[in-house]
């Protein structure tokens, strides 16, 4: 479980609830089933209209990764890659064959297989770079679906509020019913804004952020196997890979 997602969701909902309670309100008052049906499914379906079907499927397939902690550790991966580089340097590329059989990472297995086959640096790049680009495109489309749903949700909330007000104003002869209708109308607005900024939007941006980790790992692997094909010294190669994950924030 990605603890940051849990902290964000629980923390934001708790913060709003505490504020409402301090003002003498009831947070449960916004739990209006009709408003939910009008806003959230409509926003998600509108996003389906705006998103290519392949990416809609990807958005739901990769949804679990929003909440799951990805098993990606750049330092550990670099150490592993350098171990392979040392094997290549000392024993030759064919010595990697026995290691490849035990690798579960498909991209890494493909990359090392090309090294074993004697592929040149240019051939490796031509073969693996399109995979990285397509992976990036795949996750961009999947995350964009949730982001688009989040962008649509507040507007759909306003639509729901307008419908609610129309229904409420048709009951001028029944003040209690009209008041209830107006209250219900405003829950649609809250549902739309809350759904956007607490759930749908953050889900999309979280998936996008995790996709960056996947892409960065693939870039590290590509750089490593290109170095092996060139015959780079393991120490030199490790320095290059480490620089790829070293942030240097601007200090004014």
Question: Where are the regions that the model predicts?
Answer:
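Large intracellular
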Residues: 4, 15-142, 214-252
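Helix-termination/interfacial motifs at the ends of transmembrane alpha-helices
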Residues: 7-10, 14-27, 134-210
């Amino acid at each position: 479980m990605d603890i940051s997602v849990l902290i964000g969701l629980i923390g934001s909902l708790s913060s709003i609830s505490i504020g409402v309670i301090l003002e003498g309100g009831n947070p449960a008052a916004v739990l209006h089933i009709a408003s939910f049906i009008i806003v959230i499914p409509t926003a998600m379906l509108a996003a389906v209209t705006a998103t290519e079907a392949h990416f809609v499927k990807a958005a739901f397939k990769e949804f679990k990764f929003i909440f799951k902690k990805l098993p990606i550790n750049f330092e550990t991966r670099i150490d592993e890659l350098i171990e392979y580089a040392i094997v290549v340097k000392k024993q030759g590329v064919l010595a990697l064959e026995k290691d490849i059989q035990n690798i579960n990472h498909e991209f890494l297995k493909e990359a090392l297989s090309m090294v074993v086959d004697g592929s040149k640096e240019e051939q490796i790049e031509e073969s693996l770079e399109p995979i990285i680009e397509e992976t990036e495109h795949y996750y961009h489309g999947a995350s964009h679906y949730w982001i688009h749903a989040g962008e649509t949700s507040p507007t759909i909330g306003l639509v729901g509020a307008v419908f609610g007000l129309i229904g409420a104003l048709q009951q001028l002869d029944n003040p209690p019913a009209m008041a209830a209708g107006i209250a219900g109308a405003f829950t649609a607005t809250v549902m739309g804004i809350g759904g956007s900024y607490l759930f749908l939007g953050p889900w999309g941006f979280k998936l996008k952020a995790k996709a960056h980790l996947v892409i960065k790992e693939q870039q590290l692997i590509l750089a490593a196997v290109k170095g092996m094909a060139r015959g780079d010294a393991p120490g030199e190669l490790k320095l290059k890979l480490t620089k790829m994950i070293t942030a240097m924030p601007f200090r004014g």
